[in-house]
Amino acid sequence: MTTEHSQSKKTIDFGFSEVPLEEKVKKVKGVFDSVAGNYDIMNDVMSFGIHRLWKRHAIELSGIRPGNVVLDLAGGTGDLTKAFAKRVGKTGRVVLADINESMVRVGRDRLTNEGIIGNVDYTITNAEALTYPDNTFDLVTISFGLRNVTNKDKALEEIYRVLKPGGQLMVLEFSKVTQPLLAKAYDFYSFNILPKMGKLIADDEASYQYLAESIRMHPDQETLKKMMLEAGFDKAEYLNMSEGIVALHRGWKY
């Protein structure tokens, strides 16, 4: 399992490849520049459309109330931002943050067109170097984005720093399937069908191949839980969804 516990190494995984540390951000940016216009379709293809149910369940568990301040990291096209903006109301605030300008632009245009305005900010942000003061947010979410972060340990430490005491991190991410037969079927789909769907939908087989590989290289459920605790979180737990195709990790700062 590849983790970022030791950043003394000079290379890191980019899917199944090893690239120099400083190149991963650029390569990930290239992937999401390519898929930004078809991102929602991509999520449907990767999850059989079930990502909406996973996100809805995460939102219900968030406990967000009017007046809360939320940071939606790797916010993409704004699915979670939209839901949280409605829940925090006029007295709250949601920040849609993404390292990729193309994704921020798609999210901003989509939410503006849907009338989600007035309590949402948009920013290009690196999760490893958040520009917010300590103790700023009631909730930080990162949905289907942590696996693309170069230094996950640093990002988790930064998230912990900007959370208010009593605040919560929610990580919704593809994880390790717990049922052996389903795991084999999902692997076959990910590596044999998903890239071909990417070619068909977006004329981009390589980006979809990377996305499949990035899921395989992401820390498993227990490893990510341990990483959260080592980053400073006082409590961490996870909930498997769809037999572990996705896991929802939650961490609290007391």
Curated annotation (Swiss-Prot):
It holds the Pfam family Ubie_methyltran. S-adenosyl-L-methionine binds at T77, D98, N126, A127, S143. It catalyses: a 2-demethylmenaquinol + S-adenosyl-L-methionine = a menaquinol + S-adenosyl-L-homocysteine + H(+); a 2-methoxy-6-(all-trans-polyprenyl)benzene-1,4-diol + S-adenosyl-L-methionine = a 5-methoxy-2-methyl-3-(all-trans-polyprenyl)benzene-1,4-diol + S-adenosyl-L-homocysteine + H(+). GO terms for molecular function: 2-methoxy-6-polyprenyl-1,4-benzoquinol methyltransferase activity; demethylmenaquinone methyltransferase activity. The keyword DNA repair does not apply. InterPro entries: SAM-dependent_MTases_sf (IPR029063), UbiE/COQ5_MeTrFase (IPR004033), UbiE/COQ5_MeTrFase_CS (IPR023576). Pathway: Quinol/quinone metabolism; menaquinone biosynthesis; menaquinol from 1,4-dihydroxy-2-naphthoate: step 2/2; Cofactor biosynthesis; ubiquinone biosynthesis. PROSITE patterns: SAM_MT_UBIE, UBIE_1, UBIE_2. It is an enzyme of class 2 (transferase). Its EC number is 2.1.1.163, 2.1.1.201. CDD domains: AdoMet_MTases (cd02440). PANTHER family: 2-METHOXY-6-POLYPRENYL-1,4-BENZOQUINOL METHYLASE, MITOCHONDRIAL (PTHR43591:SF24), METHYLTRANSFERASE (PTHR43591). Methyltransferase required for the conversion of demethylmenaquinol (DMKH2) to menaquinol (MKH2) and the conversion of 2-polyprenyl-6-methoxy-1,4-benzoquinol (DDMQH2) to 2-polyprenyl-3-methyl-6-methoxy-1,4-benzoquinol (DMQH2). Belongs to the class I-like SAM-binding methyltransferase superfamily. MenG/UbiE family. This is Ubiquinone/menaquinone biosynthesis C-methyltransferase UbiE. It comes from Hydrogenovibrio crunogenus (strain DSM 25203 / XCL-2).
